[in-house]
Amino acid sequence: SGCIFRNITDADAIRLFTPNLTTSTGYIIEKLGLKGQRIGGAQISEKHANYILNTNNAKASDVLKLINLVKQKAKENLDLDLKEEIFYVGDFESG
């Protein structure tokens, strides 16, 4: 398993004044207040916000909705375009 999103760029870390100029997308997701957020059986991890957990028979659509929620909130609140580092398999688009 691995993280859902790539780390942010150094330029974005500077622009957002992240602590110690961290490029951690987990930090960004936590600051957006999304740690622990659930959709269906999918949940953003309480331990590391750049992971999505299957807590109760999550569907691929649940995971995709969470990913899109994070991307939407990052764009709306921070003018940040997050990029996934996962690969999509199947008959759906990444958003």
In which residue ranges do the predicted regions lie?
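Phosphate/pyrophosphate- and phosphate-bearing ligand-binding catalytic cores of soluble enzymes
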Residues: S1-V63, N77-G95
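Phosphate/pyrophosphate-binding loops and the adjoining catalytic core of nucleotide-dependent enzymes
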Residues: V70
